[in-house]
Amino acid sequence: MKVLWAALLVTFLAGCQAKVEQAVETEPEPELHQQAEWQSGQRWELALGRFWDYLRWVQTLSEQVQEELLSSQVTQELTALMDETMKELKAYKSELEEQLTPVAEETRARLSKELQAAQARLGADMEDVRGRLAQYRGEVQAMLGQSTEELRARLASHLRKLRKRLLRDADDLQKRLAVYQAGAREGAERGVSAIRERLGPLVEQGRVRAATVGSLAGQPLQERAQAWGERLRARMEEMGSRTRDRLDEVKEQVAEVRAKLEEQAQQIRLQAEAFQARLKSWFEPLVEDMQRQWAGLVEKVQAAMGTSAAPVPSDNH
């Protein structure tokens, strides 16, 4: 009887443990606080949103996902999305560093160090996701047609853990970027603690976004792409307007230069005409006097020649 009760107790405890594990497996995952920003934020956030959407699709482990996992297509897609995210993040960080020039050197160095650490953690999380999927591919290929149900369950568990860590580190990176951006906007020499005190509204805004992320998570990718296209179109129109304004300024400058050159040319012509008139007034009397002297000399020569040409009277008549 004791043995029977012990067996029943073990069976009951095993059933409870299985229910607990099933509840843990089916527990919904928290969404990223700043996912709303991925839909309407910076370019690196949009790239991270695409990585997030693709990872969520992989996590479904549908038949199509399992087929593509056996090839290198999934890891190639993740690699491209990772590279795009880190590239856009690096460009955004460089842009903020240029704006942070007026801030004290010590503050800027501390902010940059914290931001680099958060950026490295996010990159490591994405690299772990890719590495785990590559490991799963190798394990499945090594099974040689055997059941891979246990491998899929283990992969799903790892992906949930990695996804939660990715959420946490991406949220931390966004907060640190907000600190960095606030320092660039502030442009004053103050410590990191003083800047963080001014970020209370941003933290509260993140909580509000976390409360509304459930409704935003279901927004179709097409709508987000259209919104991104509209922002890009608006930016292109703004750049075109600036270019036209710059061309108008250049045209005005060219017109001013042409007017100045024409004015200077007119002044040079007037000066040349005045100088020519002055020379004429100087030399004209001399020329007239030389002409009179020459005419008188010619008359004298002609008179002298006429006298010498007259006939001499003869003595024989």
Swiss-Prot record:
The gene is APOE. This is Apolipoprotein E. The modification Methionine sulfoxide is found at M143. Its main location: secreted. Residues 158-168 are annotated as: LDL and other lipoprotein receptors binding. One of its GO terms (biological process) is cholesterol efflux. It is found in: Secreted; Secreted, Extracellular space; Secreted, Extracellular space, Extracellular matrix; Extracellular vesicle. APOE exists as multiple glycosylated and sialylated glycoforms within cells and in plasma. The extent of glycosylation and sialylation are tissue and context specific. Glycated in plasma VLDL. Residues 210-290 are annotated as: Lipid-binding and lipoprotein association. Residues 1-18 form the signal peptide. One of its GO terms (molecular function) is heparin binding. Keywords: Chylomicron, Endosome, Extracellular matrix, Glycoprotein, HDL, Heparin-binding, Lipid transport, Lipid-binding, Oxidation, Phosphoprotein, Repeat, Secreted, Signal, Transport, VLDL. Residues 278-290 are annotated as: Specificity for association with VLDL. It comes from Gorilla gorilla gorilla (Western lowland gorilla).
